[in-house]
Design a protein with these regions (language model features):
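Cell-envelope/ECM-targeting effectors and their regulatory/trafficking segments
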Residues: 1-207
């Protein structure tokens, strides 16, 4: 059974492969910045780490052999689709790797709903670049709430370096007034938040 100790081991293995001398349990900025793209056809220890992470996440790469073949490519492609990127390739990049080497779930968990999971996928697709790839487990929690605020801050034009995912003075001052008939991404985010608060609305429109 996968636990944090296994995830920490995979993170440290990645750091060793990246040449980081002082390894740690975290997937921090140095690990993120040094993490390369790993593409189909690659071989070696980095591929072992990808394959191990996929097995831990419940995706079958069809082998633990250090070869980024069709099995690994297909598994990563399925993982990306579950994250909210249905048309992405099956190659690995640092954003996907960070989410892979984590305990976050990207399939529906007990107690979750398909409506919330769909919103989580949409938030990842539109706003992960302002934060990170977040769970798509169907559960409305603190992480999802933070992602909603990051999305709002991106739409407000707050620079990524200043975005916090928290509801502070700058976010309050820039928050727009919405009126009946408005159609924009702010309305879309309001619809997402409305579903999170237990109301049934169509999230596939921005009106």
């Amino acid at each position: 059974k996968t636990g944090w100790k296994t995830i920490y081991g995979l993170r440290r293995a990645l750091q060793i492969e990246l040449g980081i001398e002082n390894t740690s349990d975290s997937f921090g900025p140095t690990t993120y910045n040094l993490c390369p793209n790993i593409n189909q056809g690659a071989t070696g220890n980095l591929v072992y780490i990808v394959q191990g992470g996929l097995y831990c996440k419940g995706y079958n790469p069809n082998g633990f052999d250090g070869v980024y073949g069709n099995g690994a490519y297909s598994a990563v492609k399925s993982l990306k689709a579950d994250m909210g990127f249905p048309n992405a390739s099956g190659n690995m990049n640092r954003d996907i790797m960070k989410a892979l080497l984590d305990m976050s779930a990207f399939t529906l968990l007990p107690g979750g709903t398909s409506e919330i999971r769909e919103i989580q996928q949409k938030l990842n697709y539109d706003y992960y670049d302002y934060y990170q790839i977040s769970p798509c487990n169907g559960l409305y929690d603190r992480e999802m709430n933070k992602m909603l605020i990051y999305g709002l801050q991106k739409e407000m034009g707050i620079p990524k370096s200043s975005a916090t995912g928290s509801w502070g003075p700058t976010t309050i001052s820039k928050c727009p007034t919405l009126n009946l008939g408005d159609s924009n991404n702010f309305v879309k985010l309001v619809r997402y938040a409305t579903v999170c608060n237990g109301y049934s609305v169509n999230v596939n429109t921005s009106i």
